[in-house]
């Protein structure tokens, strides 16, 4: 069983990319569980065709730890993907990252990881790897990490920050970086820029996902692209990303760059003057 964490700047399309990749792997015959590590509890929406499932934390609050059953918090979605949402604390009370810890520990207690799974995906909130949201890495669950980014400055800035956190954990023997996924925002020289950025981080751009309105069309219909229309070119892009992740055996300790180096890189590729 491979355990994979997806990180990335808020709004970059991380959850969309993760769910479409999960759907692609499921269509290839793999068995998956997706664990949404976001208090908004929207990391499995497309796999569940818009159905909002009860989160682990909401269920714990409603029935108490002793009465929680696995089938109450694990819902089957597209292609048999098992979907879980960690949820979060009540607004203004508690720590969202702590909620992730509680949710994953609950799943383990209930035996969710004993199922015959090929992959577990963790869809993790956060532009930085803070203590709670780093839990899938720190506790030895996630073994490989992919960062979703684009050629925009703030997306690369966030990716670099995430790499700083990963580096600390990787040096202690925890998860390694599997690569960057560029979710295109139609930035000038975007593909070349992200490739070079990845090289400087001691990793690779594992796939470049072109911008496509079909992603939005599928989302409006509450589906992944593969579920919406498996013959679309964009569906093939996600199948290709899934294949590359499945075949990937290059995992590294990242080498984050300075803010000045990032700004120089943006100038080099004509992104900023």
From Swiss-Prot:
Record text on cofactor binding: Binds 1 [4Fe-4S] cluster per dimer.
Name recorded for this polypeptide: Nitrogenase iron protein
Classification via Pfam families: Fer4_NifH
Cofactor(s) listed in the protein's UniProt record: [4Fe-4S] cluster
InterPro entries linked to this entry: NifH/chlL_CS, NifH/frxC, Nitrogenase_Fe_NifH, P-loop_NTPase
EC number: 1.18.6.1
Source organism per UniProt: Roseiflexus castenholzii (strain DSM 13941 / HLO8)
Summary of subunit composition and partner proteins: Homodimer.
Modification ADP-ribosylarginine, positions: 98
Post-translational modification note: The reversible ADP-ribosylation of Arg-98 inactivates the nitrogenase reductase and regulates nitrogenase activity.
